[in-house]
């Protein structure tokens, strides 16, 4: 499915560096580093890994003078590596000072994330918020007004709770919290416009950690503004719980046409790559038919007919192989991200699923003849057997990609002009 065939709420388009965000552009995948930004080498390495995995925007923490002092160098090192991913500065508490004191940082970032709940307190709050917006104006940068229910403006909370208590029909506590989030986002976006920031340089978000609350907040928010919306379930958690929670929330909203950029906020397992959040975000969009990022492998779950684990191992190897190739294939073979591959475990559904894919292999189940027919574009082409089935099948996949997606290939796609492109990689 082309992204334009999905019904989306109409929004302005905001440019984050070379990446457009809004209803006229594809839903954008972004991620965030967990390195100390003051450690430029570690941050460059992780940003590069996230970008190579397919992240189209990467957010970095800018929380100290030491971190701010390294942002310009980080940007230049990434550029030297051929990595043009836009960097977003995540500011809390002291962003007004850091942007003023480190102009190299302010210039190098493609967007500033501002949390209205901790930009300042009391009389200093408006002054410090204004300073950050003026920096965005001076450096011609967009901002994200990012409200989080864990860090709402305490003065605003107290005022709204007092007002609610005096209503004839007070809102329930959860409904009041959702309204606080929405009002904070919209009021601060309006304040940014009053200070002179154009409306097409504003993205907003309202983050919560409960699925149903996120859905309700964004449905309401989406009906009350035309700013692009950043979607994400904050503190989603670890492992399958985090994946399921984010998928449940984001899928409902995306199906409603709400959401212009997404991040899946997973807590990594010890030693786990940060890139998993990028893969999950891509797979949410791809399984919904909204965008394509990498060829996905169809594989049966296995049953009593598939006592061998070989088909599972082959499916895993092929999926990893395809994803590993995508940083190069994405630019070399446009359209390959739409390719489908089937790795099936027995004769029941194997031939049928294999015929429906661009390339499919039907491995023998328990008691079946130990051969594996391969189907290309619905036609049986060869039968594999022996110890080299995996290697031989990989060669068939490589040849199919080369023939069909190279220059002049029948499945090759021309660029979409969205700015979401991959440029040649350098070693790191």
From Swiss-Prot:
Catalytically driven reaction(s): (2E)-4-hydroxy-3-methylbut-2-enyl diphosphate + oxidized [flavodoxin] + H2O + 2 H(+) = 2-C-methyl-D-erythritol 2,4-cyclic diphosphate + reduced [flavodoxin]
EC number: 1.17.7.3
Binding site for [4Fe-4S] cluster: 300, 303, 346, 353
Record carries keyword Iron: yes
Enzyme class, spelled out: oxidoreductase
Gene Ontology biological-process entries: isopentenyl diphosphate biosynthetic process, methylerythritol 4-phosphate pathway; terpenoid biosynthetic process
GO molecular function: 4 iron, 4 sulfur cluster binding; 4-hydroxy-3-methylbut-2-en-1-yl diphosphate synthase activity (ferredoxin); 4-hydroxy-3-methylbut-2-enyl-diphosphate synthase activity (flavodoxin); iron ion binding
Cofactor(s) listed in the protein's UniProt record: [4Fe-4S] cluster
Domain of life of the organism encoding this protein: Bacteria
The keyword Oxidoreductase appears for this protein: yes
Cofactor, free-text remark: Binds 1 [4Fe-4S] cluster.
Pathway the protein contributes to: Isoprenoid biosynthesis; isopentenyl diphosphate biosynthesis via DXP pathway; isopentenyl diphosphate from 1-deoxy-D-xylulose 5-phosphate: step 5/6
SUPFAM superfamilies cross-referenced by the UniProt entry: Dihydropteroate synthetase-like, Nitrite and sulphite reductase 4Fe-4S domain-like
Pfam families xref list: GcpE
General function of this protein: Converts 2C-methyl-D-erythritol 2,4-cyclodiphosphate (ME-2,4cPP) into 1-hydroxy-2-methyl-2-(E)-butenyl 4-diphosphate.
Protein name: 4-hydroxy-3-methylbut-2-en-1-yl diphosphate synthase (flavodoxin)
Gene from which the chain derives: ispG
